[in-house]
From Swiss-Prot:
Protein family per UniProt: Belongs to the bacterioferritin family.
Gene: bfrB
Keywords, alphabetical: Cytoplasm, Heme, Iron, Iron storage, Metal-binding
Cofactor(s) listed in the protein's UniProt record: heme
Location of the Ferritin-like diiron domain: 1-145
Name assigned to this protein: Bacterioferritin BfrB
Annotated PANTHER family: BACTERIOFERRITIN (PTHR30295:SF0)
Subunit structure: The bacterioferritin (BFR) complex is formed of 24 subunits (BfrA and BfrB) of unknown stoichiometry. The BFR is arranged as 12 dimers that are packed together to form an approximately spherical molecule with a central cavity, in which large amounts of iron can be deposited.
Annotated source species: Synechocystis sp. (strain ATCC 27184 / PCC 6803 / Kazusa)
Amino acid sequence: MEGNLEVRQHLNQALKLQLTAINQYFLHARMCKNWGLNALNQYEYKVSIKAMKQADSLIERVLFLEGLPNLQNLEKLLIGETVPEILGNDLTMNQGIRDGLVNSIAFFETQRDYVSRDVLSEILEETEEQIDWLESQQWLISNSGLENYLQSMMGEE
């Protein structure tokens, strides 16, 4: 089924953000693993895998609409060098993803493309959950102290 060019462009933009998220979360996971922060490693790794599955659903939708998924285009990775930077950069990235998803979902409504809207709505729901989790982690650091937070992240998730 041939789809609207603008719809495919919006889907490719969402794909670009998910591909960036895969890489950023995966690198952050492995950095946390290297530091012995097993629980944080597991969380970041799981989110990286979720982003990969979300990218897969976007790729399938672009192909269904007879477009070509762009897997070569990425945003700049926001790599943290400390745990607070990692959490802050992941939050910044997710807020950008959320803004892009909300914009694209509104566009799909105007085009009456409810399937593409639903694909992005599922991603939006998970993105908002990640934003909430990241904000909670920042709250924990500010209220319990970085040392206590890091100690809590050394165990298994």
